[in-house]
């Protein structure tokens, strides 16, 4: 699935850990192009904070596709791409959602908003004939009132099936990869073979969001 967007056989681990994978929501989008900039604005169903946790940050918070979406507090999304230099694309995205009212257990979140803010930046360069390809990306996320949500999680009975772990205030992921088509040494009809290198860092608990307690 989407094999042309990365070299590995698996999707980038960092992004698929801290963000929902195959993330699509019910909503409305506006898009267009101005000069060499492509833009997109979206108003979509937001996240459910009931499933935020320490191992995946908001990665499990997506409302289920093709099921009933709670549109009480929608999310705002913006995306901008620049492609004014041949072979180069640079882009960035912004996401904001006050998630508390989307909860499957809204009574637990009275008085809270649990706002989620996500910034992403990415770039891709492809040389003529795609002989050399390089990509880089960064994701930074912030969860407001993370300490309060962590406390709510810890008080949840395990029998409910909901997370009982702390949730981070900040999560981060960044990565870069580059590959070269060695098949180009054997002519244009040779198969494309891309040995590549990739570096990736991610942390769903980059900055903890739990309440501090006095030492015992």
Q: What is each stretch, according to the model?
A:
Residues 21-22, 83, 189:
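Extracellular/periplasmic catalytic domains that process cell-envelope and extracellular macromolecules
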Residues 31-39, 47-49, 81-91, 125-132:
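Secondary-structure boundary elements
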Residues 1-79, 98-101, 107:
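Surface-exposed coil loops of outer-membrane beta-barrel proteins
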Residues 87-216:
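Outer-membrane beta-barrel pore domains
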